[in-house]
Amino acid sequence: MAKGKDVRVTIILECTSCVRNDIKKESSGISRYITQKNRHNTPSRLELRKFCPYCYKHTIHGEIKK
C-alpha cells in the first residue's frame, strides 16, 4: 500500500546566472535540468553546479517550482 506523499520527488534545476542576466539577451534561453531528490534527506531547496550551454561555463542551478 502506497502512502500519500512520495519520498523521492522530481525537481527542475534552473541556471541562476541566466535568470539574472536576462536583460543582456546574449543567451538564447535558460538552462534547465530535471532530477530527483529525497525529501527526508534534503528538505530545503537544492542547488548544484552544472554546465550551462547558454553561458558556456559551470554555474549554480537552483531548484524552482513546477
Swiss-Prot record:
Source domain of life: Eukaryota
Subcellular location, record wording: Plastid, Chloroplast
Single GO cellular component term: ribonucleoprotein complex
Gene Ontology biological-process entries: translation
Pfam family, one: Ribosomal_L33
PROSITE patterns linked: RIBOSOMAL_L33
MF term (GO), any: structural constituent of ribosome
Coiled-coil regions listed in the entry: none
Record InterPro entries: Ribosomal_bL33, Ribosomal_bL33_CS, Ribosomal_bL33_sf, Ribosomal_zn-bd
Broad class of the protein's primary localization: plastid
Keywords, sorted A to Z: Chloroplast, Plastid, Ribonucleoprotein, Ribosomal protein
Family listed: Belongs to the bacterial ribosomal protein bL33 family.
NCBIfam families: PRK00504.1, PRK00595.1, rpmG_bact
PANTHER family membership: 50S RIBOSOMAL PROTEIN L33, CHLOROPLASTIC (PTHR43168), LARGE RIBOSOMAL SUBUNIT PROTEIN BL33C (PTHR43168:SF2)
The name this protein goes by in its record: Large ribosomal subunit protein bL33c
Annotated organism of origin: Olimarabidopsis pumila (Dwarf rocket)
GN (gene name): rpl33
